Every structure is written in C-alpha cells, then in structure tokens.
Amino acid sequence: MTDETVKSLAEEIQTPVERLVQQFADAGIKKTVSDSVSQKEKETLLAWLNRDKESTSQPEKLTLQRKVRSTLSVPGTGGKNKSVAIEVRKKRTYVNRDAVEKAQAAEQAQREAEEKARREAEEKAQREAQEKAQREAEEKAKREAEEAKKKAEEKAKREAEEAKREAAELAKREAAEKDKVKQNEKPKADKADQEKARRIAEQAELKRKTEEAQRRKAEEEARIAAEKARRLAEENAEKWTSDTSSETEGTDYHVTTSRYARDAEDESDAEVEGGRGRGRAAKAPRPKKNNRHSEKADREEARAAGRSNKKGKGRKNSTLQQGFNKPAAAVNRDVVIGETISVADLANKMAVKGSEVIKTMMKMGAMATINQVLDQETAQLVAEEMGHKVILRRENELEEQVMNDRDTSDEMAVSRAPVVTIMGHVDHGKTSLLDYIRSTKVASGEAGGITQHIGAYHVKTDKGEITFLDTPGHAAFTSMRARGAQVTDIVVLVVAADDGVMPQTIEAIQHAKAANVPVVVAVNKIDKPEADPDRVKTELSQYGILPEDWGGETQFIHVSAKQGLGIDELLDAILLQAEVLELKAVKEGMASGVVIESYLDKGRGPVATILVREGTLNKGDIVLCGFEYGRIRAMRNELGKEVQSAGPSMPVEILGLSNVPSAGDEATVVRDEKKAREVALYRQGKFREVKLARQQKSKLENMFANMEEGKVSELNIVLKTDVQGTCEAITDALVKLSTDEVKLKIIGSGVGGITETDATLAAASDAIILGFNVRADASARRIIEQESVDLRYYSVIYSLIDEIKSAMSGMLEPEYKQEIMGLAEVRDVFKSPKFGAIAGCMVVEGNIKRNNPIRVLRDNVVIYEGELESLRRFKDDVNEVRNGMECGIGVKNYNDVRVGDMIEVFQVIEIKRSID
C-alpha cells in the first residue's frame, strides 16, 4: 500500500491541514504538509486521540448525597415543649445516558450480529444441502448414463460378433457351393461372382445401419437418464425449500394459538357465568363461531344471563317459561347494494346495529356517521368485512330500457354537412371571418367586440353546406372551447398574421389534438402591412402543426376577413377535408344530439341550442336532456325562423324543456314522456347522492384547515348570466381567484334575470349580485334598495374579473414594514427626577423624532423595545434632532441605559396588498 501525504489525509478525513499537523506534533510525530504518512504513524495518531478522549471522558454514574437538619418542637410532659432534632437524608444517582445508550447499542449490535450469523449459517447449510443434493443427482445421472452406454456398447459388440459369425458361415456355404459347380460353364461362374459381390455389399450396408441404430438408441437412453436425474435434483431442492418455509411458518404459531386461547376463554367464561345462576342446567358447549364480530356480544349476553339469574335466585321457576335459543352460528345474508346507500340502510340490510357498521369502518380507516351516504365500492368492502355476501344492483336499468326503446332507422348512412369549429386567440378575427361567410354583422352585436357564448350557424355556400361553431377566445372560456372541440369534425384555427401564436392559440391546438380532430389554419389579417405569414408557420410548427408545403398534413390558407381575400379557398379546404373524412349519418329515425348552449328566456322559458348528430328532430318530439325533459313546442334555426324538422349537422333552438339543461348534455328523443320524466328524476337524485358521497371525509389535515377557517375572509357572490355556458366560464374564473386569505364563494348562480329570490338570498348572506347581460326586475330592485345590497351589471368579462379582483384585494390584511429613521449613540447618562435616566446621545444616522417607537441595542443585540418619551436639546424640548447633533433622550419605563448603547428610532409603514 502506498503512503499518502498529510494534505491528502486531511482531505480524506475532512479536517484542516494545520489541525492535523498539530495533532501529529502532540502525538510526538513531526510532520509537514507535504510529508508522507505511513500506516504505523496513522495507528499511533489514532491511539493518541483515543487516549486523549478517554482522559477527558465524563464518569458514567454520579451519586449526590444531601442532608437537611432541622428541629421540631413537640409537647412534652408537664406542659413544656420538647425540641427534637430531625435529619433528612437524600441520595440521588445520575446515570450518563450516552453510556447507557452505547451499552444498549452494543447489545443491539451484538444481537444483530448473532442474528446475522445465524441467518448466514442457515443459508450456508441450505446452500450446502442443495449443492449436495444436486451433486448426488448429477453423479447418479452420470452413473446411469455410463451404465446405459456400457450396455449399449456390449449389445452392439454381441450383435457385431453374431453378424460376423453369420457372414463366415455364409462364406463357408458359398465355398462348398463353389466346389460343386466348379465344372460349370464360364458364364454361370461370372453370374455367381456378381451375385456374391451384391450379397456382400448388402450385408455391409445392413451392418452399418444396425450399428447406427444402436448408437442412436444408446444416446437416447443416456439423455433420458440425465433428464431424470435433473428432475430428481429439482424435486429435492423444492422439497428442501418447502421444508424451510414450513419451519418459517411455524413462527406464526402464536397467532393460531391465541385464537384457540380466545375461544377457550369464551367457553370458560360462559361456564363460569352459567355456574353462577342458581337452578339453571349446565350449558352445552357452544361451537366455534365463524363471525368474529359476534364474540364480544356473546360474552356480554352470558354475563347478563348470569346476573339476572343471581338476582332472581329466590324466585320459583315457572313451568310455562318462554325460552329463546340463540343461534349457534352467525347468519350470513345476501346484501343488495345500489350505487349509493346510507350507513343506516346498510346496517338494516345486514340486521346489525348502525354502531357496529361505524366501528367496522373505523377499523378500516374511514370515519362515518349514521346518515352518511356511502358509494357502492365502500359499502361492498364493509359488508364483506362483516362476513356477508354482496349483490351489486344496477339502478340505471330504466334508463337503459328507455334508450333501447327507440326507433332507429336501418337505412344506409348518407353524407352530412361537416361541423366546423372556429378557434383562436381573442381579437384574431374569428367572428369577423364567420361574418363575411354569412354576410351578416354578428361581431358588431357582441359586447366589447368579443364572443361570450357559442354561436352555431348553418351556412349554405355554392360549394356545399357547412355548420359553423364560433367559440370564444378569452381564457375564461376554456370549458366552452373544449366542448366545441368535442362535437366538431374540423377545427379552423384562426391566427392573426401580425400577432402570431398566442396562449389561447396553443390551447386550441391542444383541444383539437385531444379530440383527434383535423386542423385547417386560417392566417387572418393578411392585408395588414406588418403581416408575417412565415412567422406564423414557424411558430405553429413548434406545436406539431406543419404546413403541406413543408411536408406536413395541415392546410394553411391566407385570408382577410375585412376584404374577403382567400374566403373561397378556405371553404374549398374545409369541404376537401370533409370529403377525406367521409362524414356520414343516418337521416331517418329518432334524433340524438348535443346541447351546445342553453339559457332562460323570460317570455319563452328554457331555451336550448341543440346540434343534431343523427336522425331527424321534429316538432312535438319528447326530448331527454341530462336532468331535464320535455316536448318540443317550437323549433327555430339560427336566423330565428320557425322550422318543423332538423336533420344531421343542423343547429336549432328548441323550446319546451322542464328547465335549463347543462351545456354539453346529450339530447335524445324518446318514446314515452312519463318514462322520460322518471329517468330525469332518477338522474337528479343520483347526481345529488353522488355529490354527497364525494364530500370530504374528516381527516387530520382537514381538521387544521377547519380550525383556520375563521381567519379567512369570505366574499359571497350571487351570479346571474344570460346563457349557461357563460355562467360556467365566469364561475370557473372567479373560483380560481380564491387565495388562502380571501375565499370567494358563489352561493347562487343561474341563467336569466335577477329575481326577488336572488335579492333576498344576497341580503341574507351579505353577498354581491353580479349580473352579466341581465337586469333585475322591479321587485328585486326594491329589495336591493331596502337592504342596501351591492348590485353590479357587466357585459364584458374583463371588467367583471378586474373589479372582483380589486374587491378581494381590499379584503386582504395589509403588510406592515418597519423603516429605521435614525440611530443615536449614548455618550453619557444623567439622572432626572422626572424621567429617571436620561441618555446623552449623538445622532450618527438619520433623524430622531419624538413619540416614535425605539429599540435599545447593546452590542448589536436588542435589549429593550419601547417608546421615546423625552427629547431635548440644551434644556429645550424639540420634536426632531438631525444627524450630527447632540440631544438628551428619555426612554419611557426604562432606566438601564448605559454608555455605548445605541438607540434606534423606527416607524411602522402599512403596505396594501393586492391579488395578482
């Protein structure tokens, strides 16, 4: 081993080089930084350090003795007090915890080492046994193979000798025959020679084949013997492993014995309690129960029976006494569980108390109350834990029956118009582009020039029919934009040539990819001088949108919504993409579709915009939309004209539903209105039960959160909008504004005008009413004025979110910052009869002002914090002393001012906070 230097040794043990050199010197070894260190010198240094530690070590045990002497006056004989000397001795022993811990650690290490050695010995014995079994099996296989080979060789040798003997006899017979026909003609002799040669060749070939067959047979027997030996070795190894595992399993003996001991204890308890009852026959031994939840109840009943017999020992037993025999075994029931069930109902079905179910759930790690609703999986686990059989029931059988009882046409699917969604960033010209196609002015009618709900339009062009969905581009309408991507066939991504790719553009690409919908890019505002289409292509290529001229699959069309440039090319690209997709739908039969948008009209009631997917929607049909149902009383297209029917890819507004459906719900035409009502009510109840079942359980982290709820400010809001989709978008945007200090709570939201109920709710809960494109009626305005409720109207979502954000910022607690104004050094201390100790100071930094909070610093440590009571300069009271001047300072309620102290004057500044 090569020696290392002092420097490298210091780096290795992570200690300063100078300290290591000094330690070598203390140990009697003179070294420099570059000198080498041998192993012997290292050991010498280590011994010196250990001896040094031992010399300075503390004693392991310390005993303290204390004596307390006192006198006690006690009354004596003759009325005189007598003094008695009392001595109290106390002895206390203190043990060094480090020594005890070291001893325990040493014992633990010794036990671990013994356990490790035992395990290693067992593993070694197991390995040796396995190797021994394997060697024996291999030797046995080798012996069998050699014996088989030897037998095969002997057999082949015998057969070869027999063949040789037969050949000799044959040659002898041929020689005799040859002598017989020696006098025959020469042609006959030639023929005999040929025959002889042929027979010899056949015999040689036969001999070769025989030897080959014998060799193959010997090899096969050897292979079979080796395989047999290998299997025998594996069986021995498995047997050894199973024996070892059975020995290991033997350590769980205490589990089973404890169970048997518990059963025996139950039986002995029953016998003892039964023996207490006078006049009662001996109780037969009870068979072992298979339900562990009834053991405690059995013991309690046995004790109760013993107590009752003990109380009535003097009472004569009646011959007509009604008896009750407790079931000998637990009753396992078939429990039918629906999608949701309360704890009380589950207990009734299992015929047990609700407290037993709650105990079982607590053992499983879940807290529950008697009225809490459980989901199907939780109820199944609880019932199976209590030993019952569970039968899961589907509660949507009626819904499936209604959906199956529909007239769907068996006709062939025909081509339908493509559903095209126009997506893009806000103000990139989506609605203006659709305007030019429809030759209308929709954008001018939008508040603030931005689209705030989905517009569905069916457009007939010279090239064909197209259904357009115009989605908002604002960030708050993410859910609406995602909903548009789910029902569409083609996405037209509008990107402004002068603005490029923006956040909502990226989001639209993600929605289109998630829905697996092809994209056609419309580069808008191409007529502007600062337009840069190549920049748009480059930015979109980073997100997987490659143009066709770059080798991609996406069509890029340059358009101008103002001048109408490229509109025909865009329509051609859309219809070309639709032909590639081969969009088809069944035109006849009961219709089905999707709710695009819904709102509450004051004169017409609930109105829903439905995009038909297949079938034909007729006036008078019974429609089931999510939680709502109804018969179609009227049907209008996007232009407001009455229509009698609508085919696939047609958007229509329908009237006649029971309430406003949620946007995105499936709309299905059914046969029976009564069954449709039952399905709608079932869905409402199921939604409520599932919502209750998903309530947060009581966990430790929630307890702390609930404890701090009182410190959180709340802003209550009642929100009313014109359409359902806008209500969802604004709700999501407002909820995201909540912080840990200010919580925004939407206590009521809906579609339609602000009613008297909304105003009463806001007044009772101290809430703000927000109206988005809606107004309050006369009765609501009267209550709002009487109760002084804050009512605000909005038509653009930007201003709504900004004002709510500023209101929440006002509810935040301000931050307080301390600003140091001046610093004075104490040069001398004077005594004043009025103020006590007066510090004669020199202002070294800033200014000193009267009545400001101060800190007294001694050696840069704060020793007092209070208020400046007196500030004088040459016996005159002053309000301020500037830098470089002398002054006298009196600190309120503090007299321990010393020369050299620093007096720091500061002020507290309040800083308003805002929500980002």
From Swiss-Prot:
GO terms for cellular component: cytosol. It holds the Pfam family IF2_assoc. Residues 50-326 are annotated as: Disordered. Residues 560-562 are annotated as: G5. It is found in: Cytoplasm. The keyword Nucleotide-binding applies. This is Translation initiation factor IF-2. It comes from Proteus mirabilis (strain HI4320). The gene is infB.
